[in-house]
A protein has these predicted regions:
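Noncatalytic partner-interaction/assembly domains of nucleic-acid and motor enzyme complexes
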Residues: 1-122
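Interdomain "pre-motor" coupling segment immediately N-terminal to P-loop NTPase/helicase cores
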Residues: 100-152
Length: 152
């Protein structure tokens, strides 16, 4: 190995890593919410739509919480209908995907635990984003921007 090769990014040095996320936990949250109104009440106290890594999950979550806030049931039929009205059903994977979300959940009682995982991964992603921004500022040619960012 040449000296230059030692400094080249390798496959395991991962400059292009996947951000922290747990898609199974996200699916578990959404499936649990569609199974139980109590799960919705538990989850909405912990999770924001932006905590979801997968954009389709964010859209599904928003539809569930919209229905819940209007006092309507949020189950497979009503969530599918809500997404259809918004023109989003196909984009999130269709009715079959929503059914899969429900089928994969062993019990709606675990939705709160899954929500904690989703929030934890979202917090880690935000830390990675902040760290990346700090690195970018450190390499910026204009030191004034760095000082301004540190003081804010």
């Amino acid at each position: 190995m040449s000296q230059n090769e030692a400094y080249e990014p390798g496959p395991d040095r991962g400059l292009e890593r996947t951000p922290p996320q747990d898609l199974n936990a996200e699916r578990g949250v959404l499936g649990g919410m569609m199974l139980s109104k109590d799960a919705i009440a538990d989850v909405v106290e912990r999770v924001k739509s932006t905590d979801f890594y997968r954009p389709a999950h964010e859209v599904i979550f928003e539809s569930i919480t919209d229905l819940y806030s209007r006092g309507e049931p949020a189950d497979l039929v009503t969530v599918s209908d809500e997404l259809t009205k918004k023109g989003e059903l196909a984009r999130v994977g269709g009715g079959a995907y929503l059914a899969d979300l429900i089928d994969m959940v062993p019990t709606a009682a675990n939705a709160g635990f899954y929500a904690d995982i989703v929030v934890e991964r979202a917090t880690l992603r935000r830390l990675v984003e902040a760290g990346t921004r700090i690195v970018q500022l450190g390499y910026a040619a204009d030191g004034g921007e760095v000082v301004e960012a540190l003081n804010s």
